[in-house]
Structure formats: structure tokens, C-alpha cells
Amino acid sequence: MALHGTAQATCAATDARIELSAHHIAVGVGYVWGRGTLYDGTHAYPFTIRGGGMLSVGGMALSGQGCVRNLARLQDFNGTYWSVGGTATIHHGTAGLVMENGRGVDINLVAHTRGAFLSGQIARLSFRLKGSR
């Protein structure tokens, strides 16, 4: 998962919100798995995360929350999100993540990280609402 900087996720009133937790392990090529909840209005939708990236080493756990922009239809949330960036975590850290899928949905996330991890990578992550195909 490509994390960089310490950006703040400031949501507009029309944005959906997201909370997630995930794990990332890597030796050159990394694997990410996790779960979260998408909040749109008064509705909560659980989802899963799977994917990975290149050029990283170590392991970390992360938890975060942020904004989902340009979500015209709920099914537009499903898909592959891309991000480019890097992170370095030793013990604890805070980082920002910005990613976009092919339908123009953007996620801006602030995450707290734990572990020993170093990356400069391109990440490809699949977000899938539970119960959807």
C-alpha cells in the first residue's frame, strides 16, 4: 500500500467516509489484505481489500479513515485502485494515501502504521463491497 506524507483527509459534506484496517507484508513484491466500512449518508457498507505492490520490504499493520469522492453510484466503489508513493515505518507512524479507481472514485486516507516497513512503490488494490460480485 503506497503511503506518503502526512496529508489530512478533509471531507466535504457530499463525500462518503471510509474506515479500514489492513496488513502489508513484502520482500520486493508486497501483499495487502484487510477490511473496512464505507459510510454513505446513514448507511454503512462493509468491504474487503486485496492487492499488493512492487519495491517494498518488511511488514506493517495500518488503520485509518478518510474521504471517498466522486462516488456517484454505490457500485462505483468496487474496483481496482492505483497509487504511487512510498513510506518508511519503524514501530509507529502516520501517513497519507491518495488513490483512484477506473471509475474516477478517489480515496484520501490518513492512516496510523505499526511495524518495520520501507517502500517506494506502485500499488494496485482491489476494494470489494461484501455481497457484491
Model-derived features with residue positions:
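C-terminal segment of classical bacterial N-terminal signal peptides
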Residues: 1-7
